[in-house]
Amino acid sequence: MIEINQVNKVFYQGSKEIHALKDINLHIAEGTIFGVIGSSGAGKSTLIRCVNMLEAPTSGSIVVDGVDLTKLSKKQLSETRRNIGMIFQHFNLLSSRTVFDNVALPLELAGKDKEQIQSKVTELLKLVGLADKHESYPANLSGGQKQRVAIARALASDPKVLLCDEATSALDPATTQSILELLKEINRKLKITILLITHEMDVVKSICHEVAIIGGGELVEKGTVGEIFAHPKTELAHDFIRSTLDLSIPEDYQARLQPTRVAGSYPLVRLEFTGATVDAPLVSQISRKYNIDISILSSDLDYAGGVKFGMMVAELFGNEEDDNAAIEYLREHNVKVEVLGYVL
């Protein structure tokens, strides 16, 4: 449905070149929810703006539903964009128009008659859970309701693709989840392809079938959500996965951490388990095998794409040789181990 082929985007500040996107290649299948995640400045918003040609790529092609958008005239592009809906972080509703009239706007611009508009807008407001808000104004709506209006408006022209640019980042967690559930329902009912840009791995975990990770304008890693969570290949992927788990180190431990091992200190380690390692009794195995005691300070377990993943912060109480052997054993069994320091 969406093919992004060798896309580059260069911005210029005077004589300085800024490479926002570098040789991006992505193929997004019809009917999927595809997430693109990256930190601020990674290039993800530039990428989604290239998909509907709000930003023209410096080189490369953008193919949507078999049409190369980079080769279209302005008139052809305007017509083709009706197949591409888009929602933003900041809703972009017209404050002087009612909910009904905001959703009706694209239909009015397309020259639809009043009966068609009435029927379509009523149907869409029911779909997004705002059947009782026809005559309300944006100022009287919550953030979540405003985003629902924006979603309904984006669907007014029956697009085949819905682009979501940080659509939940201005919302509280409960409202975010309700909007994500709505997007899943829309994907299921309308078979619409959704390309979603976010900086939150929780969003990817909740809704996406596949994900691409972008850093510094480059495609770092891509795959199904299950593959990325089970077998992350890059440090950036590990960082995003880590952000979905609630782990904290007690303040008194942080104050006692030493950068190197000294007499009377013990290693504090962070263990990352993915895929099969989650269910393996590795912690009890190293305790018996290397005769060390283990104090678990915090741990968390979650699911994404049908895959379990988890993390643990623990202190190892053994002699230096046994502690190091235990750490090596865990690494040999595909556990990512990070020594955070040594607790004195």
From Swiss-Prot:
Any single GO CC term annotated in Swiss-Prot or TrEMBL for this entry: plasma membrane
Residue stretches making up the ABC transporter domain: 2-241
Membrane topology: Peripheral membrane protein
Binding site residues for ATP: 38-45
Keywords (A to Z) from UniProt: Amino-acid transport, ATP-binding, Cell inner membrane, Cell membrane, Membrane, Nucleotide-binding, Translocase, Transport
Catalytic activity of the protein: L-methionine(out) + ATP + H2O = L-methionine(in) + ADP + phosphate + H(+); D-methionine(out) + ATP + H2O = D-methionine(in) + ADP + phosphate + H(+)
Classification via SUPFAM superfamilies: ACT-like, P-loop containing nucleoside triphosphate hydrolases
Cellular compartments annotated: Cell inner membrane
MF-aspect GO terms: ABC-type D-methionine transporter activity; ATP binding; ATP hydrolysis activity
Pfam families, per database record: ABC_tran (PF00005), NIL (PF09383)
Top enzyme class: translocase
EC number per UniProt: 7.4.2.11
Protein function: Part of the ABC transporter complex MetNIQ involved in methionine import. Responsible for energy coupling to the transport system.
Subunit-structure text: The complex is composed of two ATP-binding proteins (MetN), two transmembrane proteins (MetI) and a solute-binding protein (MetQ).
Family: Belongs to the ABC transporter superfamily. Methionine importer (TC 3.A.1.24) family.
Name of protein: Methionine import ATP-binding protein MetN
Organism: Vibrio vulnificus (strain YJ016)
